[in-house]
Amino acid sequence: MQINKQLTAILLWVRIMIHLEHISKTYTRKKEIIKAVDDVSIDIKEGEIFGIIGFSGAGKSTLVRCINLLEYPDAGGKVTVDGVKLTSLNSKELRRQRSNIGMIFQHFNLMPSRTVIENVLYPLAYKGIKKGDQIKKATELLKLVDLSDRIDNYPSQLSGGQKQRVAIARALALDPKVLLCDEATSALDPQTTYEIIELLKKLNEKLKLTIVVITHEMDVVKDLCSRVAVMEKGKVVEQGEIFNVFSNPKSDVTTRFMKATSNLSKAEILIKRYKDFLNLHNGDVLARLSYIGKGVSEPIISSLTEKFHVAINIILADVALLHGNPIGGTVCIFSGDKEAIENALASLDKDNVKVEVLSHE
């Protein structure tokens, strides 16, 4: 009994590293008022990797810049990082607290006339640290990001992925507790993106970093984040555990985001442009099936064929893993007796498989 109480206490006590309360950001451009961020409140736990996603113009980059006050929120908005209310600090105190927050960007922002190690040394230059200790620190960081062999190279001699590794090492120079990543993989190819994701995972685990990831790339969110907030038109329309958000989206933008990044979204393209390829006959039904958890691995299609005597042709399929939980779907053509097809689709609905009829002949 005592053990259960202790476990409950541990689970309930989760330290909040970043607390955003009623954050708004308004711009005036050519007499037009633009609400880039609209009354957003988010809590990000210590040591977690939190994603903020949305389509272009959703306000996610503006929001993340409010965390370290590169953008000041409108009056009434409060930003607290590691227990310190940044929005209440004077400029000197804010500069000191910003050393707890590292940041990387899409375009690296390296100094081209300085070597790799000189770029990493730059944040340490005016911190009263002995030169020898600075070099030791920078060398250790470059080893951590797997760039020990590139210390004396210039940025022009590096690939995009290597440049981002230098930027990460530089962002970690002052031992921050938080790392903000603003579209950090958007300029990289898929393989390099994967490598940067794996590096961020390693840093999160090794350094106990709290990482905030701003992205429009679904694969980055799926592979990296434990929780996510979805933004549209400056608002957070949905947030929670990544599996819960994407397996059962509550907002239209989350559904559109998933469709835009899923292989199953090609079904609409097939219908509009290549209907002859589908070769739908009289009575056929084209349907999209979405399922989660154990349903992904169950023989759903073969069971339907056997039970209802309908022919099912799989046109598209997609399966993803969200923190070890499978989520997926298929686009299929159902052929056979009309009543049998209706019964087959109805049985799927009873088994918690979402059915969306896309076309029927």
Task: Specify the residue positions occupied by each region the protein language model found.
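Conserved signature/switch motifs of ABC ATPase nucleotide-binding domains
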Residues: 153-156, 174, 181
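Conserved ABC ATPase "signature" region
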Residues: 84-85, 121, 125, 132-149
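A short, surface-exposed alpha-helical micro-motif characterized by mixed small hydrophobic
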Residues: 221-223
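Conserved ABC transporter NBD signature motif
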Residues: 76-85
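Short coil-to-helix segment of the ABC ATPase nucleotide-binding domain corresponding to the Q-loop/switch region
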Residues: 114-121
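ABC ATPase "signature
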Residues: 239-240, 248
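ABC ATPase NBD coupling module
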Residues: 86-102, 126, 132, 245-249
